[in-house]
UniProtKB/Swiss-Prot annotation:
This is Acetyltransferase peniE. The gene is peniE. Its EC number is 2.3.1.-. The keyword Acyltransferase applies. It comes from Penicillium patulum. The keyword Repeat does not apply. It comes from the Eukaryota. The active site is at H164 (proton acceptor), D411 (proton acceptor). Keywords: Acyltransferase, Transferase. InterPro entries: CAT-like_dom_sf. Monomer. The lineage of its organism: Eukaryota, Fungi, Dikarya, Ascomycota, Pezizomycotina. Disruption phenotype: Does not affect the biosynthesis of penifulvin A.
């Protein structure tokens, strides 16, 4: 299958990005089995064996049988690089021993600066564990599709059947905007002016995009000179009980307000609101800091697509075989929730979480998704860069939530071969999310720790890290308690 395919509903912003899921598995796995199962997966889903064609706009891809697999063996233990240092903390705590840059280097090796293969696996075998890293071109799929690929890989390890392969609908000539289920009449009112059409969230064309990228380079230059604080990445652990306590208290506050009494906050809303509020700290003066803060949220809309798009189904609906058909697609819409520094400094965490929930509900509506997909279809040959209102582009925060992807439940026992499995089973003990993109250091990754809590990966300045450490007590979050 050497033909070139183009997804006309994928935002070209994803073209030059790669998404990686690095997994720590608590057993020594058999390299030959892992390699053979990658070959089998590619033979069944040939899009994973294809290459990226960068000469087209937007980028195209081919299907094929390329197997990009590299491995190495290190005479080290897993505790050397992944110490369990969360302890019994009752509130958020930043790791002092896990450095994301060092962790990335343990997963990512033998990777070209601009790899042409769509799918790659890197395996590092330790004395008592295995690091397995799955990488996929972001233009082909998002975080949800990445989890689908890893899940299918584990199904093959267990000798379970996986769905049949199909090309993405928009690579087969369909306009996804015409196949999103739901009407256009359920539109949330916008008294607060929170919601913007997609074209307001993006810099379109070479001139505007280049101007935005120039601002990023200038900001990076000031950091290099020491005129602005540098960003440092860390992992943060949030105990599940603490998240629930904050959520319950915030929900109690909202229930007393008529305009928000029917809104049910999610744990992700609370985590995002807490993060935004704490990194901006308390108000340093009596003045109004109007510095804009853009919070971008990525929404997976694949569930809104009509099932009939999965392979030319009849009007009677998909057949049993077509219901078992799988396609990979970057079905991600990106929307902005707008704040000011003053709001984040002075509004309650419940108010901030409410605004995030309200915006998310609005942007998840089929009408909003349709507008976004139509915008992408219209501009898929243009250069797009997210809009950042502040003069410092590193003030923007983009949320990449992995909390719905249960990597901890994946079973790698089919890859241990003749070795003895650990008493507690062959399981994933740590997940390292990463999307290598043109602008790094702006993403807030959230995922579950497998024990009821949450892990955040993000970058902050030294001042922001200090503020985060000081602002996590219930007394500071809810002063009236």
């Amino acid at each position: 299958m050497s033909a070139e395919y183009t997804c006309r509903s994928t935002n070209p912003w994803a073209d030059s990005s790669t998404i990686y899921a690095g997994l720590v598995v608590n057993a020594v796995l058999d390299l030959d089995i892992l390699h053979e199962k990658q070959k089998e997966l590619i033979s069944l889903w040939p899009i994973l064996g294809g290459t990226v064609v960068q000469s087209t706009k937007p980028w195209s891809f081919t299907c094929g049988s390329n197997v990009d697999f590299e491995s190495r063996t290190l005479d080290e233990t897993v505790s050397t690089h992944f110490p369990n240092n969360w302890g019994n903390m009752t509130g958020p705590s930043a790791s002092t021993t896990l450095d994301p840059a060092i962790v990335d280097a343990k997963f990512l090796f033998a990777i070209k600066p601009a790899p042409s293969t769509i799918f790659r696996i890197r395996v590092t075998v330790l004395r008592d564990a295995t690091l397995v890293c799955f990488g996929i071109t972001h233009q082909v799929t998002g975080a949800g599709g990445c989890f689908e690929v890893v899940s299918a890989f584990c199904d093959l390890l267990a000798n379970r059947a996986i769905p049949h392969f199909a090309l993405p609908p928009d690579a087969r000539g369909l306009k996804l905007s015409d196949h999103i289920t739901g009407g256009d009449d359920n539109v949330t009112s916008d008294e607060l002016g929170d919601f913007e059409p997609p074209e307001k969230n993006w810099n379109i064309g070479v001139v505007k995009a280049a101007t935005m990228m120039w601002r990023v380079l200038i900001a990076q230059f000031w950091k290099t000179l020491g005129l602005r604080e540098k960003l440092t990445e860390k992992y943060i652990h949030l105990p599940g009980d603490w998240v629930d306590e904050v959520r319950n208290q915030a929900q109690k506050e909202l229930s007393s307000l008529p305009e928000s009494s029917d809104v049910e906050l999610t744990r992700n809303d609370i985590i995002s609101a807490w993060y935004l509020k704490t990194i901006h700290g308390p108000s340093s003066s009596s003045g109004c800091d109007t510095t804009p803060v853009d919070f971008y949220v990525a929404i997976n809309y694949k569930g809104l697509l009509n099932p009939n798009t999965t392979g030319g189904c009849s009007e009677k609906g998909p057949s049993a075989e077509q219901q078992q058909t799988q396609y990979l697609h970057h079905s991600v819409a990106i929307f902005r929730c707008m704040f000011s520094a003053y709001q984040l400094q002075n509004d309650s965490i419940s108010s901030i979480a409410w605004r995030i929930r309200r915006a998310t509900l609005h942007y998840k509506q089929p009408s909003s998704i349709k507008k976004y997909v139509r915008f992408v279809e219209k501009n898929n040959s243009n250069l797009l860069v997210v809009d950042i209102r502040a003069s410092n582009p590193f003030s923007m925060v983009g949320l990449s939530s992995w909390t719905t992807y249960n990597y901890m439940a994946l079973d790698f026992s089919g890859a241990i071969g003749d070795r003895k499995a650990p008493q507690d089973g062959v399981r994933v003990t740590f997940v390292n999310p990463l999307a290598l993109s043109p602008i790094s250091g702006l993403t807030l990754y959230t995922l579950k720790d497998g024990k009821g809590g949450y892990v955040i990966r993000t970058a902050n300045t030294k001042t922001q890290w200090k503020q985060l450490e000081k602002s996590s007590s219930m007394e500071n979050l809810f002063p009236v308690l």
